[in-house]
Amino acid sequence: MDNNPNINECIPYNCLSNPEVEVLGGERIETGYTPIDISLSLTQFLLSEFVPGAGFVLGLVDIIWGIFGPSQWDAFPVQIEQLINQRIEEFARNQAISRLEGLSNLYQIYAESFREWEADPTNPALREEMRIQFNDMNSALTTAIPLLAVQNYQVPLLSVYVQAANLHLSVLRDVSVFGQRWGFDAATINSRYNDLTRLIGNYTDYAVRWYNTGLERVWGPDSRDWVRYNQFRRELTLTVLDIVALFSNYDSRRYPIRTVSQLTREIYTNPVLENFDGSFRGMAQRIEQNIRQPHLMDILNSITIYTDVHRGFNYWSGHQITASPVGFSGPEFAFPLFGNAGNAAPPVLVSLTGLGIFRTLSSPLYRRIILGSGPNNQELFVLDGTEFSFASLTTNLPSTIYRQRGTVDSLDVIPPQDNSVPPRAGFSHRLSHVTMLSQAAGAVYTLRAPTFSWQHRSAEFNNIIPSSQITQIPLTKSTNLGSGTSVVKGPGFTGGDILRRTSPGQISTLRVNITAPLSQRYRVRIRYASTTNLQFHTSIDGRPINQGNFSATMSSGSNLQSGSFRTVGFTTPFNFSNGSSVFTLSAHVFNSGNEVYIDRIEFVPAEVTFEAEYDLERAQKAVNELFTSSNQIGLKTDVTDYHIDQVSNLVECLSDEFCLDEKQELSEKVKHAKRLSDERNLLQDPNFRGINRQLDRGWRGSTDITIQGGDDVFKENYVTLLGTFDECYPTYLYQKIDESKLKAYTRYQLRGYIEDSQDLEIYLIRYNAKHETVNVPGTGSLWPLSAQSPIGKCGEPNRCAPHLEWNPDLDCSCRDGEKCAHHSHHFSLDIDVGCTDLNEDLGVWVIFKIKTQDGHARLGNLEFLEEKPLVGEALARVKRAEKKWRDKREKLEWETNIVYKEAKESVDALFVNSQYDQLQADTNIAMIHAADKRVHSIREAYLPELSVIPGVNAAIFEELEGRIFTAFSLYDARNVIKNGDFNNGLSCWNVKGHVDVEEQNNQRSVLVVPEWEAEVSQEVRVCPGRGYILRVTAYKEGYGEGCVTIHEIENNTDELKFSNCVEEEIYPNNTVTCNDYTVNQEEYGGAYTSRNRGYNEAPSVPADYASVYEEKSYTDGRRENPCEFNRGYRDYTPLPVGYVTKELEYFPETDKVWIEIGETEGTFIVDSVELLLMEE
């Protein structure tokens, strides 16, 4: 972060907003006509009026081609120029604008001729005029568009290129549709149609290529770079990619009637903060990680906003989001808490109303909090209020206000698509998700910034299929993904993300609502890309509809381009049986390892039930087999909770008309079985009512885990675990089984149901770790559940479709260290418990973890239950394991006592007293790092299997690590020089001449003064009459001297000199001479005073003593977790040989001194400058 001391007042967040946009009386008054406004209007037009004819032609004139002059055309490249900091040369600019003006004039003539011809289509003169106007228009466009692709200016001219390309495609479609009536021969029409299909691909690939080039160009490490990056991404999505996504609809032979598309991509407004665009160094990647990863579309239902307070300032500290699948077709699901649930004020609930949230008016808050005198300043970057406005086509809906309405208006950057109506009706985007950018830098600053995601309004809440149009539905609007199907980032021209499979199986299920009569027949088409030949299968409500063979479209390893995708269809028409149905798409007959991508499906208008007696008999048998006896006293051990749910589904599907009494009786028995299952389950909250709800009980997990309601696989809640990009930050879920629930010398079993998984690691930990990595294929391959079944009359999953019979032999049990094939969705893992001790409370840790990028899992119906008492060999084995564990535990305690004592001595020696509120006068940064490393030599602070779980030594580790943090804070506070280590570049320093801050191989930032005329200085406030120590660590290259001078306005000057000398040089008040640097380096690199130890000093215990849990005969063993030792540790690299540390004492007579750095010749390299107040 940039610690600029001159930042002492709030800078309005919207100072960079469009000055022509005002907020007046709650309405947005638009006084300008920007490229974004034009593009949004055009996108709306293309989405709603994509029908050939005079209406379309005149619509393009009204939106852009009939109203633009040179200044309006110039606004398009200017917009991008400002984003990429590149100015187009005057000649290229003038040429482009001249071409666009010529096209505009010509198209207005074309449009007027088209209008006249459509009014009198048989008039020979008008037909001849249309042939002339088309040829002129096509020739002009063919010539002009390549001139808009000027070398080196492709990016700034991209938005006008796309406008011209869109115009060209529309004209080519006109001739493809109307050419025969204009009098063109069939050969000409076919030739122009071939031009159309070819140019759709060419223009698309060009636009995406240069969009990506520009996006890469604006990326940088700091927050101001990310702001520009996000603005480029957002604005060019609106002005380029959204328009390009509709290019394929110009294919008049594929889309001869009205075609309705949807844009499911999301764009993002900046985290709402004051000073955000330039205050945070190195945070771009952190901010970008806050953006939601590719996902199925969901519908934002509610936001619960929590409030925290910091020194009297209330702010948005965290929030909880609930959402529903598309069409509200499944149970509502909740995302993990973003930020933290502050309790400074009651939570504020923002619930979905009308057509969703179309506008936010936010109030960012920035405060610099002065904590007494000196450098102890805190900065607060938060949001203290937001008004949420709801969209409606008919009436004003009351807004929801969190604390207060602000002035940062989302409509300033994402304006409406129609300015002729109120924004509530003319809005272009609705709020789809909110994440939280959180950062707390100790006592330096606190940052809590909600980040709003916005989705185009064309992405409807439901999948509606009418009768009179071609309906395109992106498959990211699916309700469920088949096992092995993933959502991946779209290639840029699909209007959103796409689905991907690498093995045969179900792709997804899509819930659709039919508004046409059920007699209406359709043909289905699929837009896909594939590296292999394959078969597509479709079904509706579990009923097979189509099956066909299709060819590969791309080579393995090639990038996705427009030509990689193909739209294919089936010849056999079909009709829906229900107004609300489930459409299922699957891919089969290809080898795993190939890639299949699905963009969307299109519905084009064209022109099983067991007998009731058998159902009852089967249900009765299934219920009776749950119990150990006919009196239903106990459950069979091998009856899982998941199986009870499936039997319950079987009973619920019995016919009320035929066997209502028997159905009710069986239902009571199944409920009794479910209660027995709950009673024997030792897990807390097995139904996943929440994660991280309570600190000391229930489930704990990472924030990217989602809880979802029951679907057609799970009757109850289940959890979804996603992959991770960093092994040290895995996706995890864990719970501890308390010692009080366990019986001595007993075997326990963890089991559950996995819908699908890859790289899912399961652990049971007591004396040692039982560990399995589970890869389970999804329901589309082995387990044909009701994923293809229709929904019920109220939108619930129809669980009455046929299932595979439950077979205990398919259970995947991993017992006594045996390896498991994991061909089944059922899993189980055993662990043996020896002697129990309530005081020790060892318990059993249950852990689920994914640490790979491609990993994923969906699981539920988890159970941890008593299996059987231990006897014979099993009893002897657990006693042996317990004894070994206790022996190693005792050894660990002995070794820890020694290491802790040494670490505590190192930490204590940093401070003056046991209150740890004041450092020793000679404590330096290297001593603190050395003590920190000593603290990190304490083993078993956290479990090696999951480093968020405290180990046996967590308390003493965190105690000492807290004091290390205090030492760093105190050390930073007593150095009155700002940015004395140059980690923030030249911030706070005044510079004359040329100097650099470089990062050397040892990852330290150093000041490099390469020229004798250069000077670096800083004015520092001090206390007159007090003593200070000026300490400088530096290195001199070549001849001459490097000097660090301290002085006041008049006299009282002293300096430290550095030279690359051989003979000894002595300076007054200096504690080190030129020939002393070797000794000095020894102090930095490995040895310190008697009150502290350095890095290289040998510890008093062996460095490789084994983990106390390791037991190779009982498990696969446990190894150290390298991520554990990264917790809180500041990697410190000693200085290279050659650097010298010198210091002098200084007694200022006024309240200001100047520190000046310079040299006489050669190069002067400064590592750090410190001015430390002497202790009184």
Swiss-Prot record:
Pfam family membership, one: Endotoxin_N
UniProt entry keywords in alphabetical sequence: Sporulation, Toxin, Virulence
Keyword Lyase: no
The keyword RNA-binding is assigned to this record: no
One GO BP annotation of this record: symbiont-mediated killing of host cell
GO molecular function (one): toxin activity
Database matches in InterPro entries: Cry1Ac-like_dom-VII (IPR048645), Cry_V (IPR041587), Galactose-bd-like_sf (IPR008979), Pest_crys (IPR038979), Pest_crys_Cry1Aa_dom-IV (IPR054544), Pest_crys_dom-III (IPR005638), Pest_crys_dom_I (IPR005639), Pest_crys_N_sf (IPR036716)
Top-level lineage group: Bacteria
Function: Promotes colloidosmotic lysis by binding to the midgut epithelial cells of many lepidopteran larvae.
Stated family: Belongs to the delta endotoxin family.
Extra remark: Toxic segment of the protein is located in the N-terminus.
Name the UniProt record assigns to this protein: Pesticidal crystal protein Cry1Aa
